[in-house]
């Protein structure tokens, strides 16, 4: 439900803001969304016992340079009791901007570190596929094989040792 509401707000922002304003709003929303990872902060922000004006002040205080539209957005979200959608809105705005600019970020997970040249080759191949620019980064989580994710366009390519081993066993059993 939050994602659907966030899409509407993101669409409105995309239509009414300049690129510079969008960048400032996205940066501020991403920073606020990071606060939501702390359950105490999230509980405070979604609490009906806390005055809306107090929530607005706390959320707006660090972002004096984010612009009028950001201030209006936070006030509107507070007024409509929708501050809890900020993480979804930050994510949706990031996706919408990436789709508009045709610039996508992705992550490569593997049990070994890939060279910059290897990452670049994979990114170039994916860039042709999505008709845009793909920038890949090495993920920090180890993976039994290799996995490439570009979430904004829904790409997930994976080759794992366990999956290949399972397919080999299935093929051997079929051949018998």
Swiss-Prot record:
SUPFAM superfamilies attached to this UniProt entry: N-terminal domain of the delta subunit of the F1F0-ATP synthase (SSF47928)
Protein name, as recorded: ATP synthase subunit delta
Entry's Gene Ontology molecular function annotations: proton-transporting ATP synthase activity, rotational mechanism
Organism: Nitratiruptor sp. (strain SB155-2)
Membrane-topology descriptor: Peripheral membrane protein
Superkingdom of the organism of origin: Bacteria
Disulfide bonds: none
Job description of the protein: F(1)F(0) ATP synthase produces ATP from ADP in the presence of a proton or sodium gradient. F-type ATPases consist of two structural domains, F(1) containing the extramembraneous catalytic core and F(0) containing the membrane proton channel, linked together by a central stalk and a peripheral stalk. During catalysis, ATP synthesis in the catalytic domain of F(1) is coupled via a rotary mechanism of the central stalk subunits to proton translocation.
Subcellular location, record wording: Cell inner membrane
Transmembrane regions: none
Family: Belongs to the ATPase delta chain family.
Pfam families: OSCP (PF00213)
Gene3D superfamilies tied to this protein: N-terminal domain of the delta subunit of the F1F0-ATP synthase
PANTHER family per the UniProt record, alphabetical: ATP SYNTHASE DELTA CHAIN
Gene: atpH
Subunit record text: F-type ATPases have 2 components, F(1) - the catalytic core - and F(0) - the membrane proton channel. F(1) has five subunits: alpha(3), beta(3), gamma(1), delta(1), epsilon(1). F(0) has three main subunits: a(1), b(2) and c(10-14). The alpha and beta chains form an alternating ring which encloses part of the gamma chain. F(1) is attached to F(0) by a central stalk formed by the gamma and epsilon chains, while a peripheral stalk is formed by the delta and b chains.
Lineage: Bacteria, Pseudomonadati, Campylobacterota, Epsilonproteobacteria, Nautiliales
């Amino acid at each position: 439900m939050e994602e659907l509401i966030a899409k509407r707000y993101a669409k409105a922002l995309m239509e009414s803001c300049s690129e510079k304003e969008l960048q400032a709003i996205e940066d501020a929303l991403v920073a606020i969304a990071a606060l939501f990872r702390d359950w105490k902060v999230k509980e405070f922000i979604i609490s009906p016992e806390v005055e809306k004006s107090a929530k607005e002040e706390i959320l707006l205080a660090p972002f004096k340079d984010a612009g009028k539209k950001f201030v209006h957005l936070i006030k509107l979200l507070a007024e409509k009791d929708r501050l809890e959608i900020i993480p979804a809105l930050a994510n949706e705005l990031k996706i919408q901007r990436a789709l508009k600019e045709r610039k996508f970020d992705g992550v490569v997970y593997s049990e070994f570190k890939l060279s910059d040249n290897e990452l670049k080759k994979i990114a170039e191949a994916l860039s042709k596929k999505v008709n845009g620019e793909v920038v890949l980064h090495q993920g920090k989580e180890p993976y039994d094989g290799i996995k490439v994710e570009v979430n904004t366009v829904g790409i997930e390519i994976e080759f794992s040792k366990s999956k290949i081993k399972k397919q080999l066993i299935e093929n051997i059993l079929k051949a018998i």
